[in-house]
Amino acid sequence: MKIIVDMMGGDNAPLAVLEGAAQAVKEYGVNVVGVGDEALVRRTAQENSIPLDGIELVNCTEVIDMCDEPARAIRQKKDSSIVVGLNMLKDGKGDAFVSAGSTGALHVGASLIVRTLKGIKRPALATMVPAKKQAYLLLDCGANVECRPEMLAAFAVMGSCYVNRVEGRRSPSVALANNGAEESKGTPMLKEAHQLLKTTPGIRFVGNIEPRDVPGGKVDVVVCDGFTGNVILKLTEGVAKMLLGMLKQMFLANLGGKLAYLLLKGSVADLKHQMDSEEYGGAPFLGARQPVIKAHGSSKAKGIKNAIRQAKICVENDLCGTMQSALDELAAAQKTEE
């Protein structure tokens, strides 16, 4: 299996990307095709004693920066690591693509270069979010700011497939993010989406979920538009950071706090592990014809390694093929209703 990796994407590239790729080759038995400035990558590997066994390098001369306008960058920077990597994926020179680069450019590239599954106009950005009971899949978390009810139904279908195939959960539950649990709550679009989700085949829809209940992790998939999802995601990240900071202040405040830390050290470590986004890999663009994984921009080696693991699982379980079959069933059901 070949995983194409953008060596130039992210705040810590190429060192962290190279380290993560090398670890993935060793731990998961995949082959990596690294796309980027070959001379820089080789020099980085040599200076940091990182083996290139199992890593094939493909040279390119451009990088899409975070400040670049996504659509223009995809059109104009043809020799960038993202464009070259996505074209390689489209041409069958790899099985999946992983990048910690520009989210917008990846979204545009996944849509225009890799193309989308039948019935999907634009892929949804999905991510596993830590929660009290268990992590849940949130989609869309930023790619599609405005959505129609039919899009949310498609997101629900794809999200269910992902949680089942990648996370191994049978009959995953799906909820619609809303400002109230009652069917009558929400905007006209959300009310219509609720009714549509009730009759969507292939999913176990459990109704609306209020934002205060989302962190409980009682459902497997939370569906929403990209604006709402991005707010939920960033608020969750902020609260997690705040709580860990408050715990640290409490433990360092006095001798009693330091003694308490010694007693709770293992539990605190478990909590940090559970809330570490790098443990969950990256955010897949669900709806692309082949797996495209967006690693966090600040990813270190562990985050890149786990994003590659995530891509491997998607390929092994034929996630895209499974989603297409489910979307075909959805389209057939909607046609029958018409």
Describe the function of each predicted region:
Residues M1-R42:
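N-terminal phosphate-binding or glycine-rich loops at protein starts, especially the Walker A/P-loop
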Residues V25-Y28, Q46-G54, E167, L197-I203:
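Short helix-capping segments at alpha-helix termini
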Residues S111-A124, P130-L138, K218-V222, G226-T336:
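Glycine-rich phosphate/nucleotide-binding loop
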Residues S49-G94:
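Phosphate/nucleotide-donor binding subsite
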Residues L15-A16, N31-V33, A39, V145-G207, ...:
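Glycine-rich phosphate/diphosphate-binding loop of Rossmann-like nucleotide-binding domains
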Residues V5-P14, A143-A153, K294-A301:
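Short, glycine-rich nucleotide/cofactor-binding loops
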Residues A13-V17, D79-G92, A96-A110, L117, ...:
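Short glycine/serine/threonine-rich phosphate/pyrophosphate-binding segments
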